[in-house]
Amino acid sequence: ARFDIYDNPDWAKGYDIVIHDECSADVKEMPYVQRILDAHKAGVPAINLHCAMHCYRTGTNDWFEYLGLQSSGHGPQKPIDIAFVAPEHPVVKGFA
């Protein structure tokens, strides 16, 4: 899936945070992906949900470097340990 909002270089202007939940594994156009990444490189934080982990397989590592991991497929479906590095941050405050 492609989203028209990402055609605008200023797509993230005015947002405090972006939640990525798109499922766009077949989108490979680097200018499009780079516009998404540029907003985050400029400081707009993001939360990336499940599908976003599998997106933008452009043949580069750009998306996966942004995520901090490379997801090439589903492994065993087991509980995932989560550690909150900033437990008082407003995004996660009160989470356990």
Role assignments for model-derived ranges:
Residues 1-15:
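Aromatic-Pro/Gly-enriched surface loop or interdomain linker
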Residues 25-95:
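A glycine-rich, often tryptophan-bearing local segment used as a flexible ligand/cofactor-contacting loop or short
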Residues 16-21:
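Structural motif
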